């Protein structure tokens, strides 16, 4: 039989139609496991940003690449870009500075204190959902304007660093002196899994409790906003109600009232809002919803030119000052000079205009030389005048311009660097010398560290102190596991576990902690007294070493001789270097590694375990082996016995996995304790073990069970010990940015 042929062009057309045009194969929606079993524990957060996803490869080290960068040359190129207006997206007032300030602000401004997520690190503004949020309309163009510079310097500067640096250069190019800049933001290669809210529609708001308070960890009032609705809460133009929301949302970004005022007043000194037309009639789909031909650009405007004087962004329209590309005091001056009355933008959005007709021509048009306008304010601007606390600050800044300028410079620096962690991570020649309390300062190493012989001797002293293996392990874990990789805060360095507020956290069992720390401090003091040559050891090092030698002892008890790596060089922070309120948000409401769970937790015990493991940058196998090992070591908070599936606690055995997988045990919910399970012998009915959901999930969840079987096998003990030590060492050194 003669076979029919399809012309090449037709075949290509057919292939493209199959790929994009609605074929059954392409369009069929796959029903995933989460649909069938919505309560199934999701392990995907522990598989984010795997090294295999990084096109630069595992040998690429961003810090080294950045150090080879000619930062001055980059800044020179960025400065030149400010006034190189492009026909496809012309600059307002011939200067892109305000546009780039908004880009940098919105990149960093999604940071939130409760879980440390968001912020400029990772360059997440490039990815969904942030690249398509309503509050980020047209910032896709800002990043495209920057592409030639990113293209030129390639791997030497990340998108995260470039966006923040561009914001800094924008300010400087308009006459403002910034506080400094630090590089070091490593780019991500996929969208971070973040709970931005449960709403199903943009600008919806279903994130408040019965008291009207925003749920944690949310940082914004509505889905798709960075902070607040500039028109007022849910679009209601009430300045005092707006002030309340501003205070809450900026506080959730770690800003106090003065920093909040400085940021708003300083930022709104520059640029303008864009609302030339009704967005519903003019603006197309966001980038994520646009076709492939749009090449990642969205919000195509079909009205007028589609840009310039026809630009539509927020729907609000106008500028705050007469010279929007220069640093002036006009924002604050005009806020108090004029009485402001409500009006509407051409797009129909509520804003404010001076009651005085003499203000009608104070502001030049951004594109039309023969056209002028009155200044405008948002409801969120009027809030700075109406709220008594904000009013005191704004009037003080108005009378003291230099104070205002410094406050804005410092607040901008904090905004753009808050998620970077300690100053030890900062890179570049523009890092400011001043140490700031929000950087969680730790004294610089100022003495020779102990050598291997000293470490061995100190370890023996710790073991001879009378402290048990579980006590030493619990203390070291409590100290180191306070780290969260989302914003690089916490950790063992600094020994803040002995300070407020960490010393009184319920998960840390304050009474036992005080006893252990007292003995370790005595060991430290006595040992330092015996050292020569100026050598010293910090309490932070002693705490970690105590846990490490306890693990070695426990492994030996299990018949495995090991050496747990230990690198000295940690220092001890002081209470004066520790902002109690700032550190309070790090307190764990749950820690599945210690089988600790409080009713203040936002999710189930197993889900909170995944959250804690994610904070510690752990993989699924690392999380699994740590839970099993810590149970065997008896490291549960307050010494509770749930999940300690061994008759020899304090020994680093794989008993947790062996006994969890033992089919001679039948599990059932306890009738006496809510949230507890009882494991009984199938034949005798005798109670063998008690457990929490965190313990049992390693046998019930198919993927976790698969890993547990590796460690519960007859040949699993040695692998278990070695893997536990690697994972333990990873946590102990999570905040060692100096090694």
From Swiss-Prot:
PROSITE patterns: PEROXIDASE_1, PEROXIDASE_2, PEROXIDASE_4. There is a cross-link at residues 105-227 (Tryptophyl-tyrosyl-methioninium (Trp-Tyr) (with M-253)). GO terms for biological process: cellular response to hydrogen peroxide; hydrogen peroxide catabolic process. Pfam families: peroxidase. Formation of the three residue Trp-Tyr-Met cross-link is important for the catalase, but not the peroxidase activity of the enzyme. CDD domains: catalase_peroxidase_1 (cd00649), catalase_peroxidase_2 (cd08200). Homodimer or homotetramer. Bifunctional enzyme with both catalase and broad-spectrum peroxidase activity. Belongs to the peroxidase family. Peroxidase/catalase subfamily. GO terms for molecular function: catalase activity; heme binding; metal ion binding. NCBIfam families: cat_per_HPI (TIGR00198), PRK15061.1 (NF011635). Its EC number is 1.11.1.21. It comes from the Bacteria. Keywords: Heme, Hydrogen peroxide, Iron, Metal-binding, Oxidoreductase, Peroxidase, Signal. This is Catalase-peroxidase 2. Its cofactor is heme b. It catalyses: H2O2 + AH2 = A + 2 H2O; 2 H2O2 = O2 + 2 H2O. GO terms for cellular component: cytosol. It comes from Shewanella sp. (strain MR-7). Transmembrane segments: none annotated. PANTHER family: CATALASE-PEROXIDASE, HYDROPEROXIDASE I, BIFUNCTIONAL CATALASE-PEROXIDASE. Binds 1 heme b (iron(II)-protoporphyrin IX) group per dimer. Heme b binds at residue 268. The record marks 102 as: Transition state stabilizer. There is a cross-link at residues 227-253 (Tryptophyl-tyrosyl-methioninium (Tyr-Met) (with W-105)). The gene is katG2. Residues 1-26 form the signal peptide. InterPro entries: Catalase_peroxidase, Haem_peroxidase, Haem_peroxidase_sf, Peroxidases_AS, Peroxidases_heam-ligand_BS.
């Amino acid at each position: 039989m003669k076979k029919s042929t399809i012309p090449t062009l037709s075949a290509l057309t057919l292939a493209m139609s199959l790929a994009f045009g609605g074929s059954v194969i392409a369009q069929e929606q796959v029903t995933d496991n989460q649909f069938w079993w919505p309560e199934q524990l999701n392990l995907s957060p522990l598989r984010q940003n795997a090294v295999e996803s990084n096109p630069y490869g595992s040998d690429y080290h961003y810090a080294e690449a950045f150090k080879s960068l000619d930062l001055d040359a980059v800044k020179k190129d960025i400065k030149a870009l400010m006034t190189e207006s492009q026909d496809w997206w012309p600059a307002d007032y011939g200067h892109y500075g305000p546009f780039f300030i908004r880009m940098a602000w919105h990149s960093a401004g999604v940071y939130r204190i409760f879980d440390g997520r968001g912020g400029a690190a990772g360059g997440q503004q490039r990815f969904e959902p942030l690249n398509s949020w309503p509050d980020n309309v047209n910032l896709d163009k800002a990043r495209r304007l920057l592409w030639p510079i990113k293209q030129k310097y390639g791997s030497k500067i990340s998108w995260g660093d470039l966006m923040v640096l561009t914001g800094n250069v924008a300010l400087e190019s308009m006459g403002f002196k910034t506080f400094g800049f630090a590089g070091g933001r490593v780019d991500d290669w996929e969208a971070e899994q973040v709970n931005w809210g449960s709403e199903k529609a943009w600008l919806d708001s279903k994130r408040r409790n019965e008291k009207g308070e925003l749920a944690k960890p949310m940082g914004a009032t509505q889905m798709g906003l960075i902070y607040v609705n500039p028109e007022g809460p849910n679009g209601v133009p009430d300045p005092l109600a707006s002030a309340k929301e501003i205070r809450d949302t900026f506080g959730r970004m770690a800003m106090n009232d003065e920093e909040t005022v400085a940021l708003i007043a300083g930022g709104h000194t520059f640029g303008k809002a864009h609302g030339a037309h009704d967005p519903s009639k003019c603006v197309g789909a966001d980038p994520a919803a646009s076709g492939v031909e749009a090449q990642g650009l969205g919000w195509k405007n079909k009205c007028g030119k589609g840009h310039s004087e026809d630009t539509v962004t927020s729907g609000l329209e106008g500028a705050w000052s007469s010279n929007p590309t220069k640093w002036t005091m006009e924002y604050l001056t005009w806020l108090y000079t004029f009485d402001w009355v409500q009006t509407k933008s051409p797009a129909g959005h509520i804003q404010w205009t001076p009651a005085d007709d003499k203000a009608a021509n104070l502001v030049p048009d951004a594109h039309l030389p023969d056209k002028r306008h009155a200044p405008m304010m948002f409801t969120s601007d009027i809030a700075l005048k109406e709220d008594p606390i904000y009013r005191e600050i704004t009037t003080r800044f108005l009378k003291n311009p230099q104070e205002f300028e410094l406050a804005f410079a410092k607040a901008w620096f904090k905004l753009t660097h808050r998620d970077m962690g300690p100053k030890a991570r900062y890179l570049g020649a523009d890092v400011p010398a001043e140490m700031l309390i929000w950087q969680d300062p730790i004294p610089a190493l100022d003495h020779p560290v102990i050598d291997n012989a000293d470490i061995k001797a100190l370890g023996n002293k710790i073991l001879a102190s009378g402290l048990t293996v579980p006590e030493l392990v619990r203390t070291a874990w409590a100290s180191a596991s306070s780290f969260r990789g989302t914003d690089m805060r916490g950790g063992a360095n600094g020994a803040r576990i002995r300070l407020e507020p960490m010393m009184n956290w319920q998960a840390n069992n304050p009474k036992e902690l005080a006893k252990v720390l007292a003995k370790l401090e005595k060991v430290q003091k006595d040992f330092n007294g015996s050292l020569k040559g100026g050598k010293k050891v910090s309490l932070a090092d002693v705490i970690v070493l105590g846990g490490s030698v306890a693990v070695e002892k426990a492994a030996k008890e299990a018949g495995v001789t090991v050496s747990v790596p230990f690198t000295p060089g940690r220092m001890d922070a002081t209470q004066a270097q520790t902002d109690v309120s700032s550190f309070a948000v790090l307190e764990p409401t749950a820690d599945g590694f210690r089988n600790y769970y409080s009713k203040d937790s936002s999710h189930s015990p197993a889900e909170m375990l995944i959250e804690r493991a994610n904070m510690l940058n752990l993989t699924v196998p690392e999380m699994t082996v740590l839970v099993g090992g810590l149970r065997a070591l008896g490291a549960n908070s307050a010494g509770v016995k749930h999940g300690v599936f061994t008759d020899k606690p304090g020994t680093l055995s794989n008993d947790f996995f062996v006994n969890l997988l033992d089919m001679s045990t039948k599990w059932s919910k306890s009738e006496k304790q809510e949230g507890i399970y009882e494991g009984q012998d199938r034949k005798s009915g005798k109670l063998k073990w008690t457990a929490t959901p965190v313990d049992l999930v390693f046998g019930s969840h198919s993927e976790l069970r698969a890993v547990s079987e590796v460690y519960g096998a007859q040949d699993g003990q040695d692998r278990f010990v070695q893997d536990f030590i690697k994972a333990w060492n990873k946590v102990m050194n999570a905040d060692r940015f100096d090694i």
